[in-house]
Amino acid sequence: NEAVEHAEIQMLASIFGAITLLCWITFRSWRAVLCVIVPLVIVTIMCNALMALLGIGLKVATLPVIALGVGVGVDYGIYIYERLQHEMTHAGLPLREAFYEAMRQRGTAAVFTAVTMSIGVGTWVFSALKFQADMGILLAFMFLVNVLGAIFLLPALAVWLGVGSEEKAPQQELAHS
């Protein structure tokens, strides 16, 4: 169990490290990185809590479940954040309107993907194999809660972190010069 716990820490550090690096390269903003990463971290903690609640032990077989859930879940955040950033940068929209446009353009696809995938893996709950049933519960949970994090937590973090203000501040200073 100690070896599996150590492996989980290494796996999560590797996954979140890679996501952080790729988000930084893609968006060139620490605010963007936090907007994408924080919901994923929270859902990962919630998944571990669900495992404890349901008595699903942390085993070599269950380690990849969280990695897969994070790997798919990051897509939802990236879909929405990319569109949010695009609408603010190219269309000049304020954050609230940019989020509306991001949801209009990418939200339906993200929700459809999450629901479809959750239903697909959710059917595994009826499997006679306990491992497959456990995976179905955990993956369906992660897919759905990750999309909810991207829809609700990501924009809240964007507002709290002042996304969009980092581009406007230098422009406002130039305008006052």
Where are these regions (language model features)?
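Alpha-helical transmembrane segments of multi-pass membrane proteins, especially transporters
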Residues: V36, L40, A67-L68, E101, ...
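Cytosolic juxtamembrane regions of multi-pass inner-membrane proteins
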Residues: L68-F112, G120, W124, L161
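Hydrophobic transmembrane alpha-helices and their membrane-interface caps
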Residues: A32-Y81, G149, V159
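Hydrophobic, glycine/alanine-rich multi-pass transmembrane helices and their short helix-loop junctions
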Residues: A18-W24, M46-G57, V70, G107-S165
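Juxtamembrane "pre-transmembrane" interface segments
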Residues: N1-S14
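Membrane-proximal cytoplasmic C-terminal regulatory module of class A 7TM GPCRs
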Residues: W160-H176
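Residue-level signature of transmembrane alpha-helical entry/exit and packing/kink sites
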Residues: M11-I15, A32, V36, L63, ...
